[in-house]
Design a protein with these regions (language model features):
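Catalytic core of pol beta-like nucleotidyltransferases
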Residues: 1-27, 35-41, 51-110
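Short beta-strand->loop micro-motif that forms the acidic, two-metal-ion catalytic signature
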Residues: 46-50
Length: 110
């Protein structure tokens, strides 16, 4: 996990707190330019939330999760995957999960 980035970025820390409180994810990753620590001041936040089970389609959960960004004055994309799907796809080197594990940051683990 990378608690240092959460200490340096109060808005990200608040978004992580909101997501963890609302969804209790298995894991929460930061990826993209911010995950690689190549972000510019106006870069968005790319987050992947891994849930034990999906109780609705992933896109619906992501739409609802995106509402938690409100009031933080940041731009964020939140993806949602089930634990099984993430773990299955991580074996494929060119997949998003594999890329996130290589280049991203783990922000939360249950």
């Amino acid at each position: 996990m990378n608690p240092e980035i959460l200490q340096q970025d109060a808005k990200l820390a608040e978004l992580v707190r909101r997501l963890v409180e609302s969804y209790r994810p298995d894991r929460l990753y930061l990826f993209g330019s911010r995950g690689r620590q190549e972000a510019k001041p106006d870069s968005d936040y790319d987050l992947l939330m891994v849930l034990a089970e999906l109780d609705a389609p992933a896109y619906r959960i992501a739409q609802h999760a995106h509402r938690l960004v409100w009031g933080l004055e940041i731009s964020a994309d939140i993806l949602v995957w089930s634990r099984d799907e993430f773990d299955r796809r991580v074996e494929v080197k060119a997949s998003l999960p594999a890329t996130i594990l290589r280049e991203g940051m783990l922000l939360h683990a249950a």
